[in-house]
């Protein structure tokens, strides 16, 4: 990516890696039960949807603003691509452990609670992405920031949804884990760390301040709207 200084295939490559890892786990594991099947399906659905959405977005926009500064610095750009590999493996570690586990415990409350969390998180992420895409597609909004829909309750509702859906995967996976596999429950914590401190939120907050930091409306939006956890805006 650095030779061409392009980030066009970053998210697509990551999504295809998720899909390949899940398909490999399914094809090599003879004990796939209902829990493993649902976790596999959910990760495949998420990866296919997000990968396609982000790839088409960067192709239409011509760039991903998160990478504006990163891609001009070799070591930081290389670190970002390397971190992408860790992103894939650690993020779905709990899911992979459950899919390949031989500990076929009965389906119970954790399974159904995880499904509810995943559907809730996935729905929020999809709606938030569509709302922002529709906002940016309206030429009258060029150069403006979105404050409508879910974006009126959170500055990054899409990332909130992603965190919740991965918590759902870990909750579903939990009963099937044994021994060292419990370490994979770090997965949702890694997602939180990555989205807040390394990628998404951190980069977009910095970018937003550079673009609209002197805008009184933006300052009001920052003051009244939570960074991540949605809430009704304070008047």
Predicted segments with their positions:
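Mid-bilayer segments of alpha-helical transmembrane spans in multi-pass integral membrane proteins
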Residues: 48-55, 85
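Intramembrane alpha-helical segments
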Residues: 6, 52, 72-74, 92-99
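Juxtamembrane helix-capping/reentrant segments at transmembrane boundaries
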Residues: 4, 9-20, 62-80, 144-151
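C-terminal ends of transmembrane helices
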Residues: 1-6, 52-59
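Select subsegments of transmembrane alpha-helices in polytopic membrane proteins
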Residues: 12, 75-88, 155-162
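Hydrophobic transmembrane alpha-helices
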Residues: 2, 17-48, 88-131, 136-235
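Membrane-helix interface/capping segments
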Residues: 42, 54-66
